[in-house]
């Protein structure tokens, strides 16, 4: 697509429209930015006008004055400029599509492999685990809701913090990476509600639970199918086997389609269970980590130029070492890696088309069930991208959970279950409470202090107060105290309830209520 000397209207400067407008203006286009939600500060709009030559408006402009309209998939189709554009049969591009076109024109990306991860759940954990796995062999830059990070040899360093996961933020992530002097082998982007069509590997973690977007005129699952429908020819798609809508949409004659299955997902149909290429299983006892020699370096996607392609397994670092032993129970030609004992007693086994590729022992300190999708999706992606199984094992066995994603820790001597993140929703809060109740029973704890709510209604559609009210009515009695976070939560009523402005204040109040044998459960929707 020719992106030169066109008249663009970029709608929604709140959710990633600003970097899109800047990129289009820098390419020699005449750009107008529409602050649809009227949330952008006047000084920011003035800077866009004076420094970048972008005309800004807080009200709709006539669609007839533009060659192309750029709008996010979540924008209400009844917005005047979109209504006019459809009536005039004017082309409307999504933020995802225009970002894809901009990225295609960036020659700096030509030698870098790109992975995009989208879905309802497990995006951040899948992307983060994959970055860890790949970094054992390659240099990786990871962009998620946790920040922009460079990964090398299983360790990360922060490049930049404060970006959202809107498609427009990818443009900023790329610039910040190159400005910092990094030239990675892989970019991994967590992206909300779809894909840009430029990924070498696209990962769809889940499509459920589905929800309405664009003023409830469309489903988020349909928008996420952009990852599938716009996938570039020759790329690979890794899709949750339960996402049948996505499997039907995939152009299998143009892209390679692989599926993965979490066996604990009760939403899978019998048909879906049969077609999965990659499956995660639990192992009742600690077992040897076997890596069949023919699976040590799968072909998958072509590796970045200049990287070694040795198929010989290296000794594992961390909790696993190369034993070099044989066992009659293992398939011929296998190399056995013996797992060191771990106190968790929880093992997983990773299968490809019915054949075991690897198994690993998990560390304690986090809710393993919250990461099942991430374990199987990241492992499948890593195998497809040419990662050695022992690197995958090392990453899994060293994994301690992600902050805000069912990680267990202590705060002032009190047990804390941290479930506060941008993807937290009321269903996640229910599951977290179930887990906390089990932990209370198993560890003979006393009460549960629940911190629940939102830091801002702008965080991924926020947490609807009416759903929180229903949650309190149903589960509030199970908690010793409930601390509701956010201005909108003041409308929620119930027994043993107090209120806090933000997560920090909520946790501070929880510490005041909690005794040494209590559990604090933090489930607040926020950027972290």
Curated annotation (Swiss-Prot):
It comes from Methanosarcina barkeri (strain Fusaro / DSM 804). PANTHER family: UDP-N-ACETYLMURAMOYL-TRIPEPTIDE--D-ALANYL-D-ALANINE LIGASE (PTHR43024:SF1). One of its GO terms (biological process) is methanogenesis. GO terms for molecular function: acid-amino acid ligase activity; ATP binding. Involved in the biosynthesis of the unique nickel-containing tetrapyrrole coenzyme F430, the prosthetic group of methyl-coenzyme M reductase (MCR), which plays a key role in methanogenesis and anaerobic methane oxidation. Catalyzes the activation the g-propionate side chain of 15,17(3)-seco-F430-17(3)-acid (seco-F430) for intramolecular C-C bond formation to yield the carbocyclic F ring of coenzyme F430. NCBIfam families: F430_CfbE. It catalyses: 15,17(3)-seco-F430-17(3)-acid + ATP = coenzyme F430 + ADP + phosphate. The gene is cfbE. Belongs to the MurCDEF family. Signal peptide: none annotated. This is Coenzyme F(430) synthetase. The keyword ATP-binding applies. Its EC number is 6.4.1.9. Residues 306-329 have a biased composition (Low complexity). Residues 300-348 are annotated as: Disordered. ATP binds at residues 119-125. Residues 331-345 have a biased composition (Polar residues). Keywords: ATP-binding, Ligase, Methanogenesis, Nucleotide-binding.
């Amino acid at each position: 697509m020719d992106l030169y000397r066109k008249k663009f209207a970029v709608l929604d400067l709140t959710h990633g429209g600003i970097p899109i407008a800047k990129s289009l203006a820098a390419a020699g286009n005449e750009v107008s930015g529409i602050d649809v939600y009227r949330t952008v500060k006047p000084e920011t709009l003035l800077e866009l006008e004076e420094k970048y030559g972008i005309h800004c408006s807080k009200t709709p402009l006539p669609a007839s004055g533009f060659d192309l309209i750029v709008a996010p998939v979540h924008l209400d189709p009844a917005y005047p400029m979109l209504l006019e554009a459809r009536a005039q049969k004017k082309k409307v591009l999504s933020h995802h599509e225009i970002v894809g076109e901009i990225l295609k024109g960036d020659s700096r990306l030509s030698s870098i492999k790109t992975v995009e991860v989208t879905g309802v759940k497990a995006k951040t954990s899948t992307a983060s685990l994959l970055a860890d796995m790949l970094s054992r062999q390659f240099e990786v830059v990871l962009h998620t809701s946790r920040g922009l990070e460079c990964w090398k040899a299983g360790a990360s360093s922060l490049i930049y913090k404060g970006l959202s996961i809107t498609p427009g933020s990818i443009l900023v992530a790329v610039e910040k990476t190159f400005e910092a002097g990094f030239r990675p082998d892989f970019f991994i982007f967590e992206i909300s509600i779809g894909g840009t069509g430029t990924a070498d590997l696209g990962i769809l973690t889940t499509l459920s639970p589905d929800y309405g977007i664009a003023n409830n005129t469309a489903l988020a699952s349909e928008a996420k199918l952009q990852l599938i429908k716009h996938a570039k020819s020759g790329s690979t798609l890794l899709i949750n086997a339960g996402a049948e809508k996505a499997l039907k949409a995939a152009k299998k004659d143009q892209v390679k389609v692989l599926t993965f299955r979490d066996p604990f997902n009760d939403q899978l149909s019998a048909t879906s269970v049969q077609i999965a290429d990659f499956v995660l299983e639990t192992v009742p006892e600690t077992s040897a980590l076997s890596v069949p020699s023919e699976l040590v370096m799968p072909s998958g996607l072509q590796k970045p130029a200049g990287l070694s392609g040795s198929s010989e397994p290296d000794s594992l670092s961390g909790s696993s070492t190369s034993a070099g032993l044989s066992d009659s129970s293992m398939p011929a030609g296998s190399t056995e890696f013996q797992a060191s004992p771990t106190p968790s007693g929880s093992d997983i086994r990773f299968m490809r088309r019915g054949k075991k590729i690897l198994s690993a022992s998990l560390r304690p300190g986090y809710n393993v069930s919250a990461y099942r999708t991430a374990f199987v999706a990241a492992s499948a992606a890593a195998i497809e991208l040419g990662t050695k199984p022992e690197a995958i094992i090392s990453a899994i066995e060293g994994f301690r959970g992600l902050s805000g994603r069912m990680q267990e820790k202590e705060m002032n001597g009190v047990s804390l279950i941290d479930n506060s993140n941008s993807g937290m929703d009321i269903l996640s809060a229910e599951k977290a409470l179930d887990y906390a109740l089990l932990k209370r029973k198993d560890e003979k704890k006393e009460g549960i202090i629940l911190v629940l709510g939102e830091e801002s209604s702008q965080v991924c559609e926020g947490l609807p107060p009416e759903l929180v009210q229903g949650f309190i009515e149903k589960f509030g009695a199970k908690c010793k105290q409930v601390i509701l976070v956010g201005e909108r939560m003041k409308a929620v009523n119930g027994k043993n309830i107090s209120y806090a402005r933000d997560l920090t204040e909520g946790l501070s109040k929880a510490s005041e209520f909690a005794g040494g044998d209590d559990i604090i459960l933090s489930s607040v929707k926020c950027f972290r």
